[in-house]
């Protein structure tokens, strides 16, 4: 029977003394006079499975070409037991892919309680001494240079198995809560976040376009069909300037005001020229939107979602997280368990958080005054030194938040929330949306946001508008917290960052 290494480690008693077939890659090999030990890994589990190869002399040995073709016989169950140690040594290299047929046997060794006694080994893919992942510790900086191979290491195998679990746990949470999954556009004329850091896309001939220094903010009152350099975008594919999306929120709002509760989960893009450990040009965002939902309910959904995902990862990837606890972030398991069991995340107002920071007697690089957005150093102080746990910051000054956020009765703040996490800083940003049409138009005018491309968005208030709320979760930032790593480049398989696009 063909099984995975994960199957064996989870329930070895089901396979003892049975003939099994498995595939994998050589992580290491050790040679003795009459034995060869192979550490095999197929990517399904953290640990390697030990394969023990003994000389079998009852048949004529095969040459290397026949040895490589042995796969055909294995698949047809026509092969005799065939292991020649000398031939095996000639072709066995770290990184090679193998098919192994043998018997699972128990051992008296606590570190390797079981092993495969090999009867047949087929070489599926060769490797050589230039293979960069030799059995030694490699730095993460080095491994980023070989992103196409780093998933074969113990560290990155663990990271991307956790990523898989977290991804589907998010879907599972919202499906169980009665949300509908929707797909929002990748190509958009709008800057939903108002950040202005957009990737513009065009089918015009770039060889004859004049060079421009900046991409205009799509919300600024400029002519959408021409640029300051005289480029006629009426001749472009869409007849106007368009960009890669920075958020699916606006479209998700439209869908929520018909389906009640929706979420979108996909890639977003930001042309921020930053080389920090927290920023990437392409990243994944999860964005739920809920009709008939106020800010307090919004906070509750965010907390329940995160606790569900953390619990699922602890349940399904405990060995991976345990490995990361030992190698990357001491105390990771305890930290995750504490947050998963937290009754209610702390909630403080922006003014309260600002006062805590100002009274901290800590010298921050970024100044503190009412109306300033909190910097990473401020977020980490609050979560790691003061509260020492996650905290919602609510009721932010309206001047530093987006136009669509609902004004509070004081008319100075908006019903916005940022969820700050230890080690990560801002993990979630969201708000109750402004449902009052006249107030929304007034805010757009104050922020000099053109209504022309957003008449459809205003229609959501004209026709059956209601209170509604939502938030955005930076998926990679969640993964940084789940894995104990400290760089966004290490939780994305093929990261796209400023001046870095190789794979």
From Swiss-Prot:
Mind listing the UniProt keywords for this protein, alphabetically?
Aminoacyl-tRNA synthetase, ATP-binding, Cytoplasm, Ligase, Nucleotide-binding, Protein biosynthesis
Q: Where is the secretion signal located?
A: none
State the NCBIfam families in the record.
asnS, PRK03932.1
The Swiss-Prot or TrEMBL record describes its family as follows: Belongs to the class-II aminoacyl-tRNA synthetase family.
Please state where this protein is localized: Cytoplasm
Gene3D superfamilies the UniProt entry points to: Bira Bifunctional Protein, Domain 2, Nucleic acid-binding proteins
The main location class comes to: cytoplasm
The protein's gene is named asnS
- Its EC top class is ligase
Origin superkingdom: Bacteria
Keyword Isomerase listed: no
Give the UniProt record's GO annotations in the biological process aspect: asparaginyl-tRNA aminoacylation
Query: What Gene Ontology cellular-component terms does the record carry?
Result: cytoplasm
How the protein assembles, per its UniProt entry? Homodimer.
Species source reads Aster yellows witches'-broom phytoplasma (strain AYWB)
Protein name per the record: Asparagine--tRNA ligase
Q: Which InterPro entries does the record cross-reference, listed alphabetically?
A: Aa-tRNA-synt_II, aa-tRNA-synth_II, aa-tRNA-synth_II/BPL/LPL, Asn-tRNA-ligase, Asp/Asn-tRNA-synth_IIb, NA-bd_OB-fold, NA-bd_OB_tRNA
Q: Which reaction does it catalyse?
A: tRNA(Asn) + L-asparagine + ATP = L-asparaginyl-tRNA(Asn) + AMP + diphosphate + H(+)
Q: GO terms for molecular function, please?
A: asparagine-tRNA ligase activity; ATP binding; nucleic acid binding
Question: Does the record carry rRNA-binding as a key word?
Answer: no
EC number(s): the record gives 6.1.1.22
């Amino acid at each position: 029977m063909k099984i995975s290494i994960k199957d064996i480690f989870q329930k070895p008693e089901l396979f003892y003394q049975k003939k099994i077939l498995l595939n994998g890659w050589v992580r290491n090999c050790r040679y003795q006079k009459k034995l060869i030990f192979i550490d095999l890994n197929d990517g399904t589990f953290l640990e390697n499975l030990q394969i023990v190869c003994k000389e079998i002399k009852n048949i004529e040995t095969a040459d290397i070409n026949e040895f490589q073709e042995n796969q055909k016989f294995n698949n047809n169950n026509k092969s005799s037991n065939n292991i020649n140690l000398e031939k095996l040594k000639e072709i066995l290299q770290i990184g090679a892919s193998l098919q192994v047929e043998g018997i699972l046997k128990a051992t008296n060794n606590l570190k390797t309680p079981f092993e495969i006694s090999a009867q047949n080994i087929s070489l599926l893919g060769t490797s050589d001494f230039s293979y960069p992942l030799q059995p030694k510790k490699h730095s993460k900086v080095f491994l980023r240079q070989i992103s196409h191979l780093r998933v074969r290491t113990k560290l990155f195998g663990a990271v991307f198995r956790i990523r898989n679990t977290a991804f589907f746990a998010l879907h599972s949470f919202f499906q169980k809560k009665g949300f509908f999954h929707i797909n929002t556009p990748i190509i958009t004329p709008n800057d939903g976040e108002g950040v202005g850091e957009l990737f513009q896309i065009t089918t015009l001939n770039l060889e004859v376009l004049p060079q421009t220094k900046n991409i205009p903010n799509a919300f600024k009152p400029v002519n959408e069909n021409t640029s300051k350099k005289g480029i006629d975008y009426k001749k472009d594919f869409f007849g106007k300037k368009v960009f890669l999306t920075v958020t699916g929120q606006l479209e998700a709002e439209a869908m929520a005001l018909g389906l009640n509760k929706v979420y979108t989960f996909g890639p977003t893009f930001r042309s921020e020229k930053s080389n920090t450990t927290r920023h990437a040009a392409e990243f994944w965002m999860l964005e739920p939107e809920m009709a008939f939902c106020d800010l307090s309910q919004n906070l509750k959904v965010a907390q329940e979602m995160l606790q569900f995902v953390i619990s699922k990862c602890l349940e399904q990837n405990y060995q991976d997280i345990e490995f990361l606890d030992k190698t990357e972030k001491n105390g990771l398991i305890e930290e995750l368990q504490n947050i998963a069991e937290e009754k209610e995340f702390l909630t403080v107002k922006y003014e309260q958080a600002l006062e805590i920071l100002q009274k901290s007697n800590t010298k921050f690089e970024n100044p503190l005054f009412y109306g300033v957005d909190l910097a990473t150093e401020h977020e980490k102080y609050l979560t790691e030194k003061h509260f020492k746990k996650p905290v919602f910051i609510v009721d932010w000054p309206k001047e530093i938040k987006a136009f669509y956020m609902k004004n509070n009765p004081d008319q100075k703040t908006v019903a916005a929330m940022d969820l700050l996490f230890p080690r990560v800083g801002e993990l979630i940003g969201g708000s109750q949306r402004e449902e009052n049409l006249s107030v929304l138009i007034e805010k757009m005018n104050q922020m000099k946001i053109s209504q022309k491309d957003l008449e459809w968005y205003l229609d959501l208030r004209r026709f059956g508008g209601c209170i509604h709320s939502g938030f955005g979760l930076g998926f990679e930032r969640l993964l940084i917290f789940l894995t104990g790593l400290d760089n966004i480049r290490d939780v994305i398989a093929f990261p796209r960052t400023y001046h870095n696009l190789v794979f």
